């Protein structure tokens, strides 16, 4: 059973950089649903998009798979396609171990492999669908072009890249507004001012967000022919790029 997120509910003498450790694993489903507007809508829509782009005899990747919620959505989207394999990657061993338990609870004929490794070092091959669900924002900005290029190089023609991210608006006044609307969303979901401020302090050094334009330029630079935002709520957006 998912535990309630209280990690930042009490004053901390010092705030360490946020990391996906065992403490976060225990509360992650509650944390992400109360923190990311539209998260459930993105997961619910993933199978529909995956089903349009999955190819027989191909691989589907969930890069930064955390507890496997998107992995399950990907699997649902390829149920009618022959000989597919899903590969989930995460650099947090506690996340991978819990994801395996989660996936084992939902049996399927579609094989899923989970690997604990750095996605920047993951070989992508024979891919029809690759998902980065709130993952790229935690990768060093100087490595993001290389990550997307690596995905493109290992993707089959007609394949799809699905990227969901927190984004920054280029207009500072609009960006401030979207941040405040996001904080209101968290307040409405029970987070206190202390929790919001301490979480922000913990995450500001490890999560660097790009503008939508930067993402689209990165897709184009890698070689993707088409890209579009397919969902946005406040400063959280989901994008699709097609090879």
UniProtKB/Swiss-Prot annotation:
A GO term, aspect molecular function: carboxyl- or carbamoyltransferase activity
Keyword presence, Transferase: yes
Ligand binding (S-adenosyl-L-methionine): 39, 64-66, 90-91, 118-119, 133, 200
EC number: 2.1.3.-
Coiled coil: none
Reaction it catalyzes: prephenate + S-adenosyl-L-methionine = carboxy-S-adenosyl-L-methionine + 3-phenylpyruvate + H2O
InterPro entries in the record: CmoA, Methyltransf_25, SAM-dependent_MTases_sf
Pfam families, per the entry: Methyltransf_25
Keyword Repeat (UniProt): no
GO annotation, biological process: tRNA wobble uridine modification
Family: Belongs to the class I-like SAM-binding methyltransferase superfamily. Cx-SAM synthase family.
Record PANTHER family: CARBOXY-S-ADENOSYL-L-METHIONINE SYNTHASE, TRANS-ACONITATE 2-METHYLTRANSFERASE-RELATED
Assembly with partners or alone: Homodimer.
Function per UniProt: Catalyzes the conversion of S-adenosyl-L-methionine (SAM) to carboxy-S-adenosyl-L-methionine (Cx-SAM).
Protein name: Carboxy-S-adenosyl-L-methionine synthase
Annotated source species: Idiomarina loihiensis (strain ATCC BAA-735 / DSM 15497 / L2-TR)
């Amino acid at each position: 059973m998912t535990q309630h997120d209280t990690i930042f509910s009490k004053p901390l003498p010092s705030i360490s950089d946020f990391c996906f450790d065992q403490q976060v694993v225990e509360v992650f489903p509650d944390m992400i649903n109360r923190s990311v507007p539209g998260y459930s809508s993105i997961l619910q829509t993933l199978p529909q998009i995956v089903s349009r782009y999955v190819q027989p005899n191909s691989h589907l990747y969930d890069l930064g798979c955390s507890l496997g919620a998107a992995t399950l959505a990907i699997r649902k989207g390829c149920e009618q396609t022959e000989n597919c394999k899903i590969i989930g990657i995460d650099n947090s061993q506690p996340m991978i171990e819990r994801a395996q338990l989660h996936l084992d609870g939902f049996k399927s004929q579609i094989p899923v492999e989970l690997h604990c490794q750095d996605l920047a070092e993951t070989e992508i091959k024979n891919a029809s669908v690759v998902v980065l669900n709130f993952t790229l924002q935690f990768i060093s900005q100087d490595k993001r072009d290389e990550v997307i290029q690596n995905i493109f190089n290992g993707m089959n023609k007609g394949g799809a890249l699905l990227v969901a991210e927190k984004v920054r608006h280029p207009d500072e006044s609009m960006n401030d507004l979207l941040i405040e609307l996001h904080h209101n969303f968290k307040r409405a979901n029970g987070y206190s001012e202390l929790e919001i401020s301490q979480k922000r302090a913990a995450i500001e050094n490890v999560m660097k967000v790009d503008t939508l334009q930067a993402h689209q330029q990165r897709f184009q630079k890698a070689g993707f022919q088409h890209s579009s935002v397919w969902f946005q709520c406040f400063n959280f957006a989901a994008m699709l790029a097609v090879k």
